């Protein structure tokens, strides 16, 4: 039987769902499965079973559960819950032994009655006289029983016990299976789950106070069934389902539901969602689905084991406030068994006691019992109209995924976001599936949902929902600058870091008037001990996209570049103004100085980026490792009114060069400065030659074209131009004072931020490629070794099987 034919649905179960049984005759075949009657409910023991490792088939496949039903006897539960997960567990009801024997006898009687009816039907069809019904011998699969008819009464006597079976057959008989549910299986138990802080709940029970609610109605971590797309957030994130306690407004809710039925479907759905959105009672559901086509109101929520135990599968989201992480949480499970005609008939009480109980005054009896485990307590209350039990399950709330975000690093208009991920779980690995960035308008970030209050008639806004999304691709370009790509797997106590680049696009669109943007960093991850994946949303403040009405430039070049090899820097120029521009790019001819760090330090930092870890310096982390397109940041321009033309600009550059050369005597003179460590006798031709070499290498980056005429650029259009550079030394260098001159309006535009170029030697580049090739080869070799081992094991197994078969054949021949 497939998993889609079995059901256990707790969501929305109510007393009215079982009203169809009130008019059903007692002798009908729909009453062949009693469920859990009142006597068994009071005397049974309850146990909460949370599997240590999640198995999807054990939660959804009926046949797989039946084959592994022995796991319900030796229950090894985990003592922790993960923040944001969909916790799937089982509540096992273990009736007493007397009840189990009574149920077996009832099943035997039902089997006999069914076989007698089948025999009578077969005899009537063949028109033959019925044989004397002195004894009925059942098949080997059914129990061996003899039915004798004396004095109009039926007595059931067992035959003599057969000889004890061998040990193998005894083990097969001891194995537990899942019984197939009958068509009358019904949910005669209702569950209410409350999550409380353990210390607060224990204090509230002693002082008769209500414990504080720790549910987070706008959770930071939530469970999602499907992966998120880039243009929306899953509805399960913005519509978290919670039940409210409807003890005071039951009649009002029924009237509201009747009124909603006359309205449109959209209004009906929204009202239904709001009516059960807030409260201390968490809505629970179960993965099984089974419904009788003839009875649409049927909602069974359990399955029975062959030993007589009942199993109720339940799933509940763990959405708890972040302040309660790493603390002991108490899950309070209140079990209600509402009475109806069917339950009264199933009870062992006589009619007189039921009538007296129905007309008696309200009275309750409280009782409490403790199980063998310290973390599980059972209590109960018996009322005249329903019976309740309470189960307490303690667990520790953990969050194994620790995330650290740093976004205070900017290069031009580009925001560099450093993301550090850490797996704090001691034993399980974490698989990080995706990491994305979503932008929100501040004014639409939080929207309130109006719901009905519990204690008063008026409605109050209590829930905050996530606001509307801004399409990221229209305003920003997001890229991952790290070497490794997702998904990745983090082992216990391991860390992983990456750098995300967020930069505005060259062609901007009109934005809605807002104060700014909120950024959500979305991280989806999976852990083997939990079901599905967890979606974590972290808030991050981003800068507003720079808006200009003149020019915007973005650069594209290879990084790192190879020593003594020419490379191109591509300038993409967008004319955002309403007028025509005739542009020329000017590169300053002065000596381009090296950045603050020395070349040896740069080489050490570059080598540290090969392991996938990013350092605190965003320049090294973004430029090391591999060739990245659109590496340069989008650079905005300052408009400068100038009365001089292009020639004056070159004169200014020469003056600046003169100032820099005056500050450094080595650049303007060939005389060596006298220092305390240098003696005049040491001056020789060799020292002068070494000085000339240093002087020549001070030009670290050489531009082969000082000026490039771009030409006319129409309004709202873009154009690109490439300029060649030649690196002469290893390090990280800056290209400063790049200007654009508009000959029509005679305006000079200068770039705010310099371009940064990283240059490495060919040997260093070859080492990186060799290391990457070695890693790939090692992984391939491991896979090949594993495959070879599997092939060898399979061959050995086949050889062993063949040898065993040959031995068996030889033994038979000898016999």
From Swiss-Prot:
Signal peptide positions on this chain: none
Compositionally biased spans, kind Polar residues: 135-154, 174-183, 612-639
CC annotations in GO: cytoplasm; nuclear pore
Low complexity bias spans: 595-611, 640-668, 783-809
Region span, Disordered: 123-183, 249-274, 592-668, 765-815
Ranges of biased composition (kind: Basic and acidic residues): 765-782
Lineage: superkingdom: Eukaryota
Protein name in the entry: Putative uncharacterized protein DDB_G0279765
């Amino acid at each position: 039987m497939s998993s889609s034919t079995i059901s256990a649905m707790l969501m929305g179960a109510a007393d009215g769902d079982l009203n169809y049984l009130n008019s059903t005759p007692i002798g009908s075949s729909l009453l062949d499965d009693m469920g859990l009657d009142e006597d068994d409910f009071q005397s049974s023991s309850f146990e909460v079973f949370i599997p240590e490792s999640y198995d999807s088939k054990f939660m959804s496949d009926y046949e797989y559960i039946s084959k592994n039903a022995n796991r319900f006897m030796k229950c090894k539960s985990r003592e922790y819950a993960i923040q944001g997960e969909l916790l799937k567990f089982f509540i096992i009801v273990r009736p007493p032994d007397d009840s189990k024997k009574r149920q077996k006898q009832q099943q035997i009687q039902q089997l006999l009655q069914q076989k007698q009816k089948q025999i009578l039907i077969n005899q009537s069809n063949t028109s033959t006289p019925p044989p004397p019904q002195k004894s009925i011998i059942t098949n080997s699969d059914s129990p061996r029983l003899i039915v004798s008819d004396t004095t109009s009464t039926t007595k059931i006597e067992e035959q003599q016990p057969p000889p004890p079976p061998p040990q193998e057959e005894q083990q097969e008989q001891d194995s537990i299976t899942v019984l197939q549910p009958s068509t009358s299986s019904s949910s005669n138990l209702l569950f209410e789950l409350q999550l409380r802080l353990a210390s607060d709940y224990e204090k509230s029970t002693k002082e008769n106070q209500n414990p504080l609610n720790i549910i987070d109605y706008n959770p930071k971590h939530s469970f999602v069934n499907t992966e998120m797309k880039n243009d929306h957030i899953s509805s399960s994130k913005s519509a978290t389902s919670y039940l409210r306690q409807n003890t005071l407004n039951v009649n009002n809710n029924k009237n509201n539901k009747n009124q909603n039925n006359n309205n449109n479907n959209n209004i009906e759905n929204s009202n239904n969602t709001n009516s059960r959105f807030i409260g201390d009672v968490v809505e629970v559901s179960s993965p099984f689905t089974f419904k009788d086509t003839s009875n649409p109101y049927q909602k069974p929520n359990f399955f029975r084991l062959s030993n007589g135990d009942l199993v109720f599968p339940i799933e509940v989201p763990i959405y708890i406030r972040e302040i309660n992480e790493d603390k002991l949480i108490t899950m309070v499970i209140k079990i209600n068994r509402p009475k109806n005609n069917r339950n009264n008939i199933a009870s062992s009480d006589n009619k007189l006691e039921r009538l007296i109980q129905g007309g008696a005054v309200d009275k309750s009896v409280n009782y409490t019992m403790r199980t063998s485990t310290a973390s599980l307590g059972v209590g109960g209350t018996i009322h005249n109209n329903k019976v309740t039990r309470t189960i307490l399950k303690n667990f520790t709330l953990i969050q194994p995924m620790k995330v650290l975000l740093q976004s205070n690093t900017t290069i031009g208009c580009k925001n560099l976001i450093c993301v550090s991920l850490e797996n704090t779980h001691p034993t399980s690995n974490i698989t990080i599936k995706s990491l994305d960035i979503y932008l929100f308008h501040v004014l639409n970030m939080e929207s309130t949902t109006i719901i009905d209050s519990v204690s008063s008639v008026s409605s109050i806004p209590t829930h905050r929902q996530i606001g509307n999304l801004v399409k990221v691709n229209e305003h920003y370009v997001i890229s991952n600058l790290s070497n490794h790509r997702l998904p990745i797997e983090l082992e216990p106590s391991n860390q992983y870091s990456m750098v995300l680049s967020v930069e505005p696009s060259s062609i901007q669109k009109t934005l809605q008037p807002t104060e700014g943007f909120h950024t959500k960093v979305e991280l989806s991850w999976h852990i083997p001990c939990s079901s599905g994946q967890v979606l974590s949303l972290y808030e991050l403040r981003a800068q507003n996209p720079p808006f200009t009405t003149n020019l915007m430039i973005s650069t594209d070049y290879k990084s790192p570049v190879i020593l003594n090899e020419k490379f191109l820097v591509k300038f993409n120029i967008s004319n955002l103004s309403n007028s025509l521009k005739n542009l020329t790019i000017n590169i300053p001819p002065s000596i381009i100085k090296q950045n603050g760090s020395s070349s040896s330090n740069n080489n050490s930092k570059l080598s540290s980026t090969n392991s996938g870890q990013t350092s605190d310096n965003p320049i090294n982390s973004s430029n090391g490792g591999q060739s990245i397109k659109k590496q340069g940041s989008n650079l905005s321009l300052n408009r400068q009114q100038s009365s001089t033309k292009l020639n004056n600009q070159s004169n200014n550059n020469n003056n600046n060069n003169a100032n820099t050369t005056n500050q450094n005597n080595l650049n303007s003179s060939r005389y060596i400065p006298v220092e305390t460590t240098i003696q005049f006798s040491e001056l020789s031709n060799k020292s002068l030659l070494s000085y000339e070499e240093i002087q020549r290498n001070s030009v670290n980056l050489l531009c082969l074209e000082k000026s490039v005429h771009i030409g006319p650029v129409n309004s709202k259009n873009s154009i690109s131009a490439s300029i060649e550079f030649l690196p002469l030394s290893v390090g990280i260098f800056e290209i400063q004072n790049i200007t654009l001159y508009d000959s029509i309006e005679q305006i000079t535009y200068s770039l705010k931020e310099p371009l940064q170029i990283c240059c490495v030697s060919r040997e260093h580049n070859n080492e990186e490629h060799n290391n990457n090739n070695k890693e790939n080869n090692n992984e391939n070799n491991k896979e090949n070794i594993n495959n070879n081992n599997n092939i060898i094991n399979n061959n050995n197994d086949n050889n062993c099987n063949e040898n065993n078969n040959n031995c068996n054949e030889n033994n038979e021949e000898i016999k």
